[in-house]
A protein has these predicted regions:
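ALDH superfamily catalytic-core signature
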Residues: 146, 224-354
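Short, solvent-exposed polar/charged micro-motifs at secondary-structure junctions
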Residues: 101-104, 202-206, 310-315
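Short glycine-rich or small-residue beta-strand-to-loop segments that form or flank ligand, phosphate
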Residues: 47-50, 62-66, 133-135, 160-164, ...
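A general secondary-structure junction signal
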Residues: 81-85, 196-198, 354
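Conserved active-site and cofactor/substrate-binding residues in soluble primary-metabolism enzymes
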Residues: 4-11, 32-42, 54-61, 65, ...
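N-terminal Rossmann-like NAD(P)+-binding subdomain of aldehyde/semialdehyde dehydrogenases
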Residues: 1-123, 151, 293
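Structural signal for hydrophobic packing residues in well-ordered secondary-structure cores
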Residues: 17-24, 45-52, 66-74, 78-81, ...
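Rossmann-like NAD(P) dinucleotide-binding subdomain of oxidoreductase/dehydrogenase enzymes
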Residues: 112-254
């Protein structure tokens, strides 16, 4: 992460204070955190019935207040995620938290649609599913929780979160803060809840629970597969491998800036981060020069061969061609390249190999 500045130190202090304030005994639902799936779903269902009965204007007020509170907490939650998971870049997590807080659509997406004609009038009004079960990943715990929350409650739903076990503390902190903001604005308690000790088993229980009407999953292939077999509607986001295509019409300086910004964002742990670069042959040298001018490290074939031995150091699992070294996931290029004897600073955000 590099040297701590005054802002970082202040966030650490806020984090510790908040942590001490939240130690109020065992989870039992008073803060939206439940020890078992059934209790969480039952409380969430009660809250959803109250929530869906409120006027749409009240939803707007609550969501506006929630956004305000989440903006205030963006830095502390970013620190919490970085501290617990050890993945990505703290400063990028702040930007990510603010992005989903400000840009996730709210009730403005619920506009009714009407058709009229010779056969009469048809009115389309969107209705809530009810209780939604959401499985969140270790790579994107805070932003996924915020995004899911705003979108789901805007539609009149409630949500039960099952966090990745390696991100349970920061996800719990987010859920508690969300619940407090909703109640402050006049919404019902337990509209957004979580599982105190999330596991693979609790995730499976949540996906198959008769009290949930929809499953939302953000994660790897295995959890997505389970969700698709759960017997109910599922919205799933799995692994991503997005390409960048650069041709001779591109502004190469701008392209280089965008490539580094997108591919290095939060150390490429987001599925939508660009991961492949395809370039028209006639401009390769010019684009490489533009990337190097922005401190991008271009690896040689020999360096890549050494790096592959570090990145794919784990035994391959069944059905996989290679085993990924999990210790390298989400780390700065400086930490990864150090493993093969290349020393660069943390200001090097991206390394590219052909």
């Amino acid at each position: 992460m590099g040297d701590l500045n005054e802002r970082d130190i202040n966030n650490i202090v806020q984090y510790v204070i908040a942590e001490l304030q939240e130690r109020r005994g065992e989870p039992g639902g008073t803060s939206g955190i439940f020890s078992d799936v059934s209790s969480a779903v039952a409380a969430s269902a009660r809250a959803q019935r109250m929530w869906s009965a409120l006027p749409l204007e009240k939803r707007k007020e609550v969501i506006a207040h929630l956004r305000e509170r989440l903006r205030e907490q963006a830095q502390v939650l970013a620190w919490a995620a970085w501290r617990e998971t050890g993945l990505g870049r703290y400063e990028d997590k702040i930007e990510k938290n603010l992005l989903v807080t400000n840009k996730t659509p709210g009730v403005e997406d619920l506009e009714p649609v009407a058709w009229s004609g010779d056969r009469g009038l048809t009115l389309l009004e969107r209705a809530p599913f009810g209780v939604i079960g959401s499985i969140t990943p270790v790579t994107n715990p805070i932003a996924t929780t915020i995004n899911n929350t705003i979108a789901m409650i805007a539609g009149g739903n409630s949500v039960v979160f099952n966090a990745h076990p390696s991100a349970k503390e920061c996800t719990t902190r987010t859920i508690v803060g969300i619940g407090q903001a909703i109640v402050e604005a006049g919404g019902p308690a337990n509209l957004v809840v979580g599982i105190a000790e999330p596991t693979i088993e609790s995730a499976q229980q949540l996906m198959k629970h008769p009290g949930t009407q929809l499953t939302m999953v953000t994660g790897g292939e295995a959890v997505v597969h389970v969700a698709m077999q759960s017997g109910k509607r599922a919205i799933c986001a799995g692994p991503g491998n997005p390409p960048i295509v650069v041709d001779e019409t591109a502004d190469l300086d701008q392209a280089a800036r965008d490539i580094i910004k997108g591919a290095s964002f939060d150390n490429n742990i987001i599925c939508t981060d660009e991961k492949n670069l395809l370039v028209v042959d006639s401009i390769v040298d010019r684009l490489v020069a533009a990337l190097q001018a922005l401190n991008c490290r271009i690896l040689t074939a020999e360096e890549l061969a050494r790096l592959e031995k570090v990145i794919f150091a784990e035994p391959a699992k069944k059905g996989q061609a290679t085993g990924l070294n999990k210790k390298m996931i989400g780390q700065n290029p400086s930490a990864i390249l150090k493993e093969i004897g290349i020393n660069v600073g943390d200001d090097v955000r991206l390394a590219i190999a052909e």
